[in-house]
Amino acid sequence: MRGDENAAGPQRARSASGDELDALIHEGDAEVLLALLENPNMQEQHVSRLLERLDLSAELLQSVAKEGKWNSSESIRIRLARHPHTPRRVALSMLRKLFLFDLVRVSLLPSAPADIRRAAEELIVARVPHLPIGEKLTLARRGPARVAGAVLAGGHPQAVKLALANSFLTESQVLKILARAELPARVVVAISQHPKWSVQYNVRVALVRRPHTPVPALLEFLPDLALRDLQDVAGLEQLPEHSRKYVQQELARRASEIK
C-alpha cells in the first residue's frame, strides 16, 4: 500500500490543475516536484513561485534550466541565477542571458551566492563602455560598488557626480580607481573636492600621487599626511614636478619644526 501511495504522488503531480496544482508547489517530496515539471498545466507563474523555495535540489533546478519553455523566460532565468542551489555552470549560463538591470538586481541580492553576485558585476562592467549615457547614469546612481566605479572611471561629468554619491561605493573602490594608470582629470578633481571621499586619509594619500589633483587640495592634504607617507610620496619617480615641490616644502617645514 505504501508503494502505491508513493507512486500516486508523482502521478497526481503530472496531471494536477487549479488549487491542487498550487498546493503541490509546496510539496516536500522531491519526486513530486520533479513530476510537476512534466505537468502540461504548469505555467510560468507556477514555476516562478516554485523557484522562490530555497530548499529545492540542484537536480530540480537543473531540470527547469534545461526546459526551453522555462529558460526563455527572464523571470525564471533571474530566479535560477540567484538560487543558492543552482549549479554554478547553470547559474552563469542564466546570468549571461539576463537584461542589464536584471543583472544589477542579482548583483545586489544578499541571498544570491557571492560568486554569482561577483559574476553579475563582471558582466555589467564589461558592458559599461558600450552603454548609452542614460543607462550609465542609472548604473552610476544605483549600481553596486564595482559597477559605480567603472562608470566613475569613464569620466562623464554627470556620471562622476552620481557615482561619487552612490551609497554602495566604497573607499576600496575609490582607491582602485585612483590607482589606474590612465584616469580622466575630472575624476581626480571631483574626488579631491568631494565632501565624503576627500576627507578619507588613504584617499588623500592616493590623490597626492595624481598629476591632476588641484594645487589647493594638494596644499590642504599634505599637512595631514604621516611623515612616512610623505617621504614615500617624495620618493616616487613619476610624481609630477609641481607636486614634488610642495611635498619637499612640507618635509622642510616639518624638519624646521623639529630643530
Q: Which stretches of residues belong to each language-model region?
A:
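Alpha-helical scaffold segments
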Residues: 1-259
